[in-house]
Regions:
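Glycine-rich adenosyl-nucleotide cofactor-binding module
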Residues: 81-85, 107
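Active-site glycine-rich loops that stabilize anionic/oxyanionic intermediates
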Residues: 82-83, 91-94
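Structural cue for short, hydrophobic secondary-structure segments
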Residues: 88-91, 115
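Conserved alpha/beta-hydrolase
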Residues: 96, 103-125
Length: 128
């Protein structure tokens, strides 16, 4: 009897130094622990660009745009050329190129995609 290969889900392990720091802070001050946790939960994690996103990274027209309302600069990706445009928006700790499979399908359908790296995400500067 052969076993079916199960798909392995992605799990982000909490680094031990973070766990040790949180445990130490909890022992001395719940207020400090709360501030530490808030900082962790409001700081995006920057991930290395995977190979599957390299094509979009290379083929898109990239520009930096200043958003005066929040006084932050973001990187914008224009992928393909068409009068029909679709805006793609990534999630927390994401980047504009991570929706490349969707962007490629839209490109085949005759659309140009516009995506961006939110502040402190991908190539955009900053931290929260």
């Amino acid at each position: 009897m052969s076993k079916k290969k199960q798909k392995q889900s992605q799990v982000i392990e909490i680094p031990k130094p973070i766990l040790y720091t949180a445990n130490f802070l909890q022992a001395i001050s719940s207020s400090l622990t709360t501030k530490f946790a808030a900082k962790l939960f409001t700081t995006p994690i920057r991930h290395k660009l995977p190979k599957r996103e390299l094509h979009m990274e290379r083929e898109s027209v990239q520009k930096s745009i200043m958003i005066p309302e929040i006084n932050k600069e973001i990187v914008v990706y224009e992928y393909g050329k068409s009068d029909k445009k679709v805006l793609l928006v990534h999630g927390w700790s994401g980047r504009g190129t991570q929706l490349v499979k969707i962007a490629d399908e839209l490109l085949k359908m005759g659309y140009m995609t516009i995506s961006f790296d939110a502040p402190a995400h991908g190539k955009s500067k900053g931290n929260y």
